[in-house]
Structure formats: structure tokens, C-alpha cells
């Protein structure tokens, strides 16, 4: 009997694009009436994020082509603690949800900004901004709104300084990615050359970085928003409320965990949490649930997983869960 060797290339490895195609096909097969709503939700969310993606990839490509990324990375040397504080405070003003912040995190990491300030902005930004502060106050009261704002900055500081302490473990946080393959290589960088378009090698780097990073972010954020659409449609809020009606440590921690699949952006969350509290959710559990959902939703986790190495991903989840639980417990004791 003759064995026929099977080439590995005959079975291409699944990619995120396969899942992007498979999700609408599965919805069309099992719930055809929902297909239009799922696609519309994902398209609207992605359309709202496209300006951020464009800004981020232009920034990355421009900095790479000019050689300025080294100067930006050097600007944080010896100033990391101050940068963490500023990043946590700025995160409270930036109107980004947990998915919209991903392009900017990719840009900061790509140009060598240390993980401490990046993590501070990463954790604080999805939690609060001035418009959502007003919306939260209207739905849940100023005590809850101020508590969430303070929690956002505190979580940013906690995550930033924790990551600074662990920075020796993460010398290369980004996952390796395929370059554009143009063969030109990056130009030798000394002083930044701001008029990069006058040099053929730097124009090539700009075009390559623009294409590679643009496709990368578009792919993973498309997947993230399709997952978000599924979460919103098929995960009932009422099913979660019955599990988190108490005030104890376990209940608050469970609320932080359950907040992850129940995607909560900073504008829709207050009305949902108000309804959950009317069904018996405690204030401490509600705070943990809201923070856990804003920082570590499944769509955001999918995008983060594609961006950083597994060790950084695990720390990101651990900081989000720990911070959400602590915020809930402290808020419960105060109110």
C-alpha cells in the first residue's frame, strides 16, 4: 500500500478573515431574520471607528518613514511615572470605547512608548469621558458618575504602575507580524527626516506601513464589531441580573467577570445598569459590572489578542478584572 504524502500547504491556516465571513453565514443559516440587524450594527460601529483607524495608521506610517519613532520612545525615558499619571488623566477625557482605543494603542506600542503609560491610557480611556459622565449622572445619579470617573483614573494609575513594575518581563510586547514584503527595508534612521516623501526608500516604508497596519486593524476590528453585534443580540441582560444581586466579594468579582461578555459602551451602559439595579443588582456589583464590561469586553479582547503577546494579554485581563472588582468593593463601602 502506497501512502500519498499530504502537503501542509493543501490546508491553509484559518485566519480572522475566515471568521469575519463565517459569522454572517452562520447567522444567515440559523437566524436569517437577524442578519440585517447584525450586519448593520457591525457596519455602523466600524464606520464610526474608521476615522480613528485612518489617523492611527497615518501616524504609524509617518513616524516610521520619518524616523521620529525613536525620538518619541526616548521622550519617555526617565519620565515614565509622570507619563503614567498624564495618560490616566487623559484617558478620562478621551471619548473612546474599548475597541476604538485599539488603533491608538497599536500606534503607541509601534513607536516604542513604554507599556506603563500605554496601559494607563488603555484601561482608563474606555471608562469615562465628559459626555458619558453626564449620561451616567442622568441615569444613575452623580454619586455613581463621580465614582466611575474616579475609578477610571485610579484603574489607569493602578494598571500603569503595575505594568511599569513588570516591564522587565515584556521587552517586546507586540506580536510579530508579517511586513509588507516589498524588500526595501526600513531606511537607516538618524535624525528624523520630516520631508520623507523626497526620499524613495522612505516613501516605500510609508506605503508599506500604511498598507500592513491598515489591513491589520481593519481585519481585527471588523471581527471585533461582528462579535459585539452577536453579544448585543443574543446575550440577554436579564439573564445576568439574577446572578449578581448581593454585596459580597464573590458577587462583586462575579459581576466583573460577567461584565466582560455583556459589551457595555459608555453611552448605552447607564440605562442597562439602571435596569439591572431595578432587578436587584447592588451598587457595588453594578460598578464592577460596568467597569469590567467597558474595559474587557469580548470584542476588545479579540482585538487585543491580535495585537500583543499572550503574556501582555493575560496581564491586561488580570488588571481589568482586579481593578473592576476593587472599584466595586470600594464604591460599595462608600455609598
Model-derived segments and their meaning:
Residues 83, 91-149, 232-312:
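Membrane-interfacial helix-loop connectors
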Residues 18-28, 56-62, 153-164, 224-230, ...:
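Hydrophobic core segments of alpha-helical transmembrane domains in multi-pass membrane transport
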Residues 2-4, 83, 137, 141, ...:
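Juxtamembrane and boundary regions of transmembrane helices in multi-pass small-molecule transporters
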Residues 51, 55, 98-102, 132-133, ...:
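Alpha-helical transmembrane segments and their lipid-water interface positions
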Residues 11-27, 49-58, 176-177, 181-193, ...:
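Hydrophobic mid-bilayer segments of alpha-helices in multi-pass membrane transport proteins
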